[in-house]
């Protein structure tokens, strides 16, 4: 559910309140009420924002010349591949996030509708890491027989794609521990991750080890309510979900 679609939410704790949900409501239920058409004529709204994110603070690492000088000063063995690579900068970037939300509604108190569309695109400070989320929702309300019968029909769909790497901790640890005289990539291709290494690996190889996921959800529901008297009503509810 897109946050802007939420009108209110209620926490149900009593047995009488959660009985409708059977065993799934044994530990309580969070009931979310989403916005619907108001029947006040055509209305349209848009919300959007864009933000940039960057690392607040980063450790100062030795460059190639400083690395070699330190190794020589303390009599340490070292390899010099002739490069000057800042591996922390090689795996990070300036991130950005954008949100867009469009909703429109219309109709009369007896027959109204509301549709909304939300989009989130987030590129994190880690290269090749981010997510996209697309949400669409449509609700229609129709009254008949002197407003005694009320029908509510709704459709909801979402698509979520998460571009993630397998081990963020190893990525940063490896970038900070890597010899800066090594290149980020080999001249004839990429570095290969060493499966026997528990902590340090070529950062480029760690960055390419993916843990991507993609989810799609669809839900349609129909509720009919008939007021037989002022104190007695009959309801029927049906829903279909796919994930």
Which residues does each PLM region occupy?
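N-terminal periplasmic accessory domains that precede
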Residues: 19, 25-48, 100-103
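Short, glycine-/polar-rich solvent-exposed loops and beta-turns at beta-strand/coil boundaries
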Residues: 2-4, 21-26, 93, 129-132, ...
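Transmembrane beta-barrel domains of outer membrane proteins
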Residues: 12, 33-35, 103-107, 116, ...
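Residues that cap or anchor secondary-structure elements
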Residues: 16-17, 84
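Short acidic/polar hinge/loop motifs at secondary-structure boundaries
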Residues: 1-13
């Amino acid at each position: 559910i897109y946050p802007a679609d939420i009108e209110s939410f209620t926490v149900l704790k009593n047995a009488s309140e959660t009985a409708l949900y059977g065993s799934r409501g044994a530990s309580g239920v969070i009931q979310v009420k989403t916005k619907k058409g108001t029947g006040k004529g055509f209305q349209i709204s848009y919300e959007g924002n864009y933000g940039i994110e960057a690392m607040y603070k980063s450790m100062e690492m030795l460059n190639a010349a400083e690395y070699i000088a330190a190794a020589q000063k303390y009599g340490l063995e070292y390899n010099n591949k002739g490069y000057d690579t800042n591996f922390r900068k090689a795996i990070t970037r300036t991130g950005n996030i954008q949100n867009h939300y469009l909703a429109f509604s219309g109709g009369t108190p007896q027959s109204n509708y509301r549709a909304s569309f939300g989009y989130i695109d987030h590129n994190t400070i880690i290269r090749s890491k981010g997510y996209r989320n697309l949400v669409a929702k449509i609700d229609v309300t129709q009254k008949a027989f002197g407003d005694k019968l009320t029908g509510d029909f709704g459709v909801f769909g979402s698509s979520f794609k998460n571009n993630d790497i397998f081990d963020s901790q190893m990525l940063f640890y490896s970038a900070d521990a890597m010899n800066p005289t090594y290149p980020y990539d080999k001249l004839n291709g990429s570095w290969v991750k060493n499966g026997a290494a528990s902590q340090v690996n070529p950062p480029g190889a760690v960055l390419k080890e993916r843990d991507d996921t993609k989810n799609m959800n669809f839900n349609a529901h129909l509720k009919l309510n008939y007021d037989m008297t002022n104190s007695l009503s009959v309801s029927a509810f049906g829903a279909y979900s796919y994930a």
